[in-house]
Amino acid sequence: MSCFKQDVYNCITPKTLSFVKSFLKQRSNDPAASTHLSSARVVEWNLNGIEVDSRARDELKAAVNILFRIMKYIGQFPFPKLSSKDDSEIISLTVQEFVIASVFISGRYRKLFGNDNGEIIWKFLFIALSHQSDMNFFEDDLDHLFTIPLKYPIEDGDSIAIKAQKVDWGGLEIIKKLSNLDMNQLQLQPSLFLNLTTLFLLTESIPNQKHNKMHDQFVHNLTTWKDFRKYSLDLLRYMNNDLSKDDLNSQTLSWSEFSLGMNNLLAPFVEVNLRKVVENNVLNISLPFFETSANSKMDGTGDEVPNGATTGTKTTMKENEGAGVEAQSKEETKVGNDVESSFGSKLVSISLIAYISSMLRGIGSTIEVTRFNAIKLFAGLEAGFSIRSLENKIYKWHAPTLLFVSGKRIKQRTIDTNRRYQEFDETYPKFFQANEDLLKSWQYTNDRITYCVLINQPWQNSNKKNFGDEKSLILSLEPRADYYTSLHSEILKGQLIYFNNSGMGLGFGNAQPLNKSNNKKYYPGDVSLTIESNLEFAVFRHLGSLSTNATTYFNRSRLPSTVAHEDFEDRFLITDLEVWGIGSKKELEEQQRQWKWEEQQAEARQSVNIRNMGEERAFLEMAGLVGNNGSGGSL
C-alpha cells in the first residue's frame, strides 16, 4: 500500500488513542487543541521554588533534554530523524511525537511489531545518544509516497483503526534498515547516558503511588542528585569498567558493550524507569500540554500557560475526575513526613537502596527491596565491630537480609606493618605470585570498595556446616556494578554461607575453614567473599581464567568486558559493616514487638538486680568480705 507520511502516522495512533487520552487529560479530539512541549518548560515546571545546587540543576536539564531528544527521534517513527547535535538546544515535542514515543516507551509497540523486534527501542536509544547526524533513514518529504507492507488487503470502507491492524509493522522499511545496520560503527557518549541513568535511578527510588506523592518525592530526592549520580556511574561501569568520572566526555561506549550490558543487567532498570518518567508522569511531562484558546496566558519564556495556572506557581495533575490542571501553593507541594531523607545510616541511603533494587530487578531476583521494607539490624559503627554483637543482632531475624561491607583498598603500608592483617594473610591461601601486579587496569589504590550479600535464609551458627540456598547472591556495588549468582547444584544446594563465631568470621562461597589448636586456614571458593573474625579485613576473590581445586559456589562475572575471564581480588580494610532485614510490613511489626518485649525484660532484670544489691552487700559485710567503706574487707 502506498501512502504519505501523515497517513502512516495516523495508522499508528489509533492503537493507543484511549491510553493517550487518559494520560494527557485531553479535553478535545481537535488536533488544534494542543501544541508543542519544550524540554526547558518541563525543567522549569519541576524546579520552580526548589533549592537544588547548580550542578544538579544543570544535569537535570541535560537529562530532560536527552530524554526529549530520544522521544523526538522515536516519535518520528517510522521516519526517524535526528535533531541538532547541540545538547544545549531546547528540544520540543509535538503531541504526535509524544504519542508515538509513548507507544514505544510503554512497551505497546510489541503488539504491533511482535516480540522478535524487542531490541528496536534500544537501537533507537543508542542512535539518539550517539550524535550521528547522518543516521536519518528517509527524506524529509511530506509529499513523497511510501510503500508499507500489509498483512491483509485494505478495503474502501476500512477505518484508520482497521487499517492499522492490517499493516505488517514488522515488515516496514525502517525495521529492515535497522536490522541490517552495522551498529558498531556508532559510539555512545557515556556523559549523556550518565545524566539519563541518574534521572532513572532517582525515579527508581520512588514507589508507585498517587501521582502527587510520586512527584513530591521526586522533587525531594533531587536534593541528593549527586548521590544518585555516583551510583549511576557504577551502573554504567557494568558496560565498561574503565569509565572514569574525570574523563567521561572523551570516552565512548560501543554497541556491543551497550547491548550486552542491557541484556545482562540494565534493560529492566531502563525500561521500567523510562516508562515511569513518561507514563506515570513523575516529571509532570504532560502538564504543559494545554488548550489553545483566548483564555490561555503567556509566561516570560514565550510558552503558553495552562488555564487555571499562574506563572511561577507549581502545578500538579489532579488525580480524580480528569479535570486537567489545578494550581497548588508551595505549602501544598512540600514533601510530607512520609518522605524519609535518610535511614540513620552512614552507609545505606535511599539512593543505595534504589541502586540495589535496580540490580535485583535486572538479575531477575524475586526479592524486592524498597525503603519501606528494609530495617537496620546491625551497624558496626553503632554496636561495635564484634562478631558476638553481630550474632546477637541478626540471629533473631527470620526473613531475608542484606549484608553490606565497605572499606578502602589495602595499601602497601598495611601489608608491611599491620600485624593483624599479616596474621589473616597467613591463613588466607595466596593465588598470585609475589612479583605479580595485584591490581588490574580498572582497580585503583584509592578505591572505595562495597559489596552486598543477599542472604535468603535466616542466619545460623555454622561452625561445622554451611547454610543457605540458591537465592543467595553477591552484588558488587563500588567501584563498579557486578553480580555473582549462586551456582545451581543438586549436591551443594546453595549451602555456601558460614557464620563462624569461634575465630574464623564469615564466608560466602567458601568451604568450611580449618580451626584446630594453632592451625587455622581458609578455603575460599573461586568466587567468594571472606570477612575475618574481627570484622576488620575482607577479601573478594574472582578466579575466571582457570578452575582451581576449590569448590565453586558462585557463578563468575557476566561482565561484557574481559572481567569475566580475569583473576583478581579486592582486599580492603573494613570501615562500615551493616546488616538490614528485608520483610513484609507484618514481619517488620512482629520483629519490632519482639525487640520491645526483650528490652522490657532486660530492664526488669536490671531493676531486680539493683533492688537486691543492698541485701547482698549486707551479707558480704557480715562475712567480713566487704568493708563499710566499700573498698573490700579483711580476713
UniProtKB/Swiss-Prot annotation:
Cellular location(s): Cytoplasm
First-listed, main subcellular location of the protein, grouped into a coarse class: cytoplasm
InterPro entries, per database record: TLDc_dom (IPR006571)
GO (cellular component) term, any one: cytoplasm
Keywords recorded for this protein, A-Z: Cytoplasm
A matching Pfam family: TLD
Regions crossing the membrane: none
Domain TLDc residue range list: 346-583
Region: Disordered, residue numbers: 297-333
Role description: May be involved in a process influencing telomere capping.
Family named by the database record: Belongs to the RTC5 family.
Name of the protein in question: Restriction of telomere capping protein 5
Lineage of the species this protein comes from: Eukaryota, Fungi, Dikarya, Ascomycota, Saccharomycotina
